[in-house]
Amino acid sequence: MAIFKVEGGHRLHGSITPQGAKNEALQILCATLLTPERVTVHNIPRILDVMQLIELLRRMGVEVEQLAEDTYSFCAKEIDFEYLRTEDYRRRCTRLRGSVMLIGPMLARFGVGYIPKPGGDKIGRRRLDTHFIGFQKLGAKFNFDIADEFFMVEGKELKGTYMLLDEASVTGTANIVMAAVLAKGSTTIYNAACEPYLQQLCKMLNRMGARISGIASNLLTIEGVDSLGDTEHTLLPDMIEVGSFIGMAAMNQSELTVKNVSFENLGIIPAQFARMGIRFEQRDDDIYIPQQEHYSIDTFLDGSIMTIADAPWPGLTPVLLSIFLVVATQAKGAVLIHQKMFESRLFFVDKLIDMGAQIILCDPHRATVIGHDHRIRLRATRMTSPDIRAGVALLIAAMSAEGVSTIQNIDQIDRGYKDIDGRLNALGARITRIDDCE
């Protein structure tokens, strides 16, 4: 198992470009199953989760060709349904939560979809009810084999309908949209997720011949079509990487430029960093973060402690809360971090407390952080990455700490960040990757 050795106290300097968006990539790659025509996708991040999905598609029978370092073409003329019953298919799907989005395209085009209970980050319960209730409303029959933990959905002729989702699930909305584009008649989805990556999926499907309206709102209307054609698509930059790099610059008192961020698709993220007292400038489509010795957290108008909470888009994406939390440990002032959507994503704060951070874990959803204002440096320690984003938060803490920290289970970080050690070392960080470490 690989580990990181991180020597803290080295400031960053220079510029860095975010990779293509992982969460968009998972949706877009699954959507290639909707057509027998060739779909070319650019700006694909070469990270573990995405590469695993590409290999899974290849084993399912999709013709996959790498055209450039970050460009692949996909042609799903046929699917090997015998493979979907194999242990290899089960094993690969259970490692990747995004594999659940294979069901919608398979159901729409082939009338049946199989998937084992998917895996992914251990960050609490994440229900799949929204996906399957949506399929049932379109006329599909759902079955879950409890013994094998295997989902099967069948529906030879899906029919459009109205549905009000019980939660604005991003993957649930994507799955239902992909099923509905080939259904008969009109489908209306209310309380749909509307984040930029879902918008990108809908725009790509429209270029392929789908008829989706209401894009960027929480009310989508889909007029079913008989078939979809070929297209090319370019992924947006990953907003989570953008936020991570802003946090790194502030925490390490560094001057940094984040290039080609697609600022218009960052939503409330820049404003939330501004509430943390972090200064930055928008320069065309780049974000410049000047070196700051101190940053002060705002308070509410009545003087009460600032709260930063996640919410469905256009609210703050929950995957950045761990970054805000670790950045707050060296801010001036205090902040309440409220993680509403997952109940286990804040448990990594124990390691930050071991490093000397002042954090009160109020309950599984809330933590109060009292910043050191860079008067006291965090202490190096040994820690384990529990999931992708908490792993990067711990990496940020280690980069600013005094001494050499060890981070285990860095495969979790590799799932979401391409060559993160090499890219940060090029900016001045001191991160050593040690492979096959027991």
Language-model features, listed with the residues they occupy:
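Short, structured segments at the rim of ligand-binding sites
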Residues: 1-438
